[in-house]
Amino acid sequence: FPRREFLIPIIGITGSNGKTMVKEWLYQLLSPEMIVTRSPRSYNSQIGVPLSVWLLNENTQIGVFEAGISKPGEMLALRDIIQPTIGVFTSLGTAHQENFPSLEAKCLEKLKLFHDTQAIVYSEDDQVLNDCISAKNYKGECLNWSAKDVHAAFFIKSIEKKDLETTVSYVWKEKVEGQYKLPFIDDASVENS
């Protein structure tokens, strides 16, 4: 399969919501500096993922691919195709819940995408997600973010919404302080930022 031919960083994104938005944001952030290959549209299914990964070429410097599942057993095949080096877990919600016995079971299935990644980015404030990551004894770097835990890798000090803009103030790894502005105010987009 063509993925093995490319020894480059590959970001794998999963979650119940926000996969496409986060993928497109990462593309916008990375593409001025790097040649990025990404999933077209919302190609995150058993058919869409292979089509997306086939887009990798000799010029690609980093790949960004979504992985979506709707039932148990689907993520292992997607993991084998994407082979991510970095993982992003956007959110854990009730989408496609009807095929899973519990939210925890769905979370554990989604986390299979990140089995061999060097790092995973996720919300520590989602207790189910945080507990599932702890239970899996994840070996990579946990780049957790939190609005509650000052010791999180990315601590959100404050979120200020004004007019149609949101300002997020943060502390990175308890050392670097900064802020960024978003051109929207809805909670889902702010959380995925």
Residue ranges and their predicted role:
Residues F1-D125, L129-E141:
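Phosphate-binding loop of NTP-binding sites
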Residues L103-E104, G140-S193:
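Adenine nucleotide phosphate-binding catalytic loops in nucleotide-utilizing enzymes
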